[in-house]
């Protein structure tokens, strides 16, 4: 990568076939999950007219993901990671089929939506952890920043496309189409993943799973990179259906709300060329997080939905910068034998923030207007973020030696 370039270098997709297969599978998977992500809150909102119920579904799914990430972290450090990935994807597809069949019933079951959310949240997180742990083996640690940015770009571009498609499907065909296409896409991802080489974990002594997990906790707590970053602001999506009523948005326009954050994040990934050369990544990560919280606070105050979309896109861009820096610092400083557990714990931190935020925002939405709920969450997190900036001294002062630019990077 040219040292002076802000643009992302995509050469890994050409030089590493296994990473290219993961890229393709992840893109298809994210598009499929995006269709699901639009359908579930809209269906629950239509059935219950309650933001609290929408928040509960996100919280339950987040809780299942937390457990799955804990289990998946241990499994990824003990067992062949390719098998874990394939198992997780296949079982998720079964859950999506269940959601589709439930939506086709004359009176869909709300309980079934909650239970299938638990199922999909648990098994999806198993695959996420194993994929993250296998990344360094697929591309080499020297390429982790580049791989992380490409991965983020894959996720965000898929997340931009799928909500808009999902919104159009909701307006024309109903939620069953979203669920059915999500299931089909999930099973299609198995095809490129089957071409992956075996991904065995590094040799290490066998120990009790809980003891193994505690070892990961101890390492993470001893790391100066424990940022304590809160991601609750991204849980504002539980208010989208209610805010759509406030802004008098159509079903198709709701999709733009869901697409705004990943669009901003995609721009952040595309312009991440210089992030690897940041001398103080910890400080940059904290400042970008503060900016993202401010964007969420302003989001709910916008008089028109299009201005709200701009605020969400800004949040996505700043969040992308923060997430990419945190990802790279953790991956490069974590021993290979602990990558599964550390990635599981790190991702669980984000999922926990989203789940707690969804529950709080759902409750606020029941007591306050959606506009007030969104603004209160953003400005509240901004205050907490300023305190974190002052308290997390080691992270704020953390310095790294910028990587040397090689001929292959130019």
Curated annotation (Swiss-Prot):
Keywords: Cell inner membrane, Cell membrane, Membrane, Transmembrane, Transmembrane helix, Transport
GO MF annotation list: enterobactin transmembrane transporter activity
Periplasmic side: 43-55, 105-109, 178, 234-250, 302-307, 372
Topological domain spans for side Cytoplasmic: 1-21, 77-83, 131-156, 200-218, 272-281, 331-350, 394-410
Subcellular location: Cell inner membrane
Function statement: Component of an export pathway for enterobactin.
Family indicated by similarity: Belongs to the major facilitator superfamily. EntS (TC 2.A.1.38) family.
Name listed for the protein in its UniProt record: Enterobactin exporter EntS
Taxonomic lineage of the native organism: Bacteria, Pseudomonadati, Pseudomonadota, Gammaproteobacteria, Enterobacterales
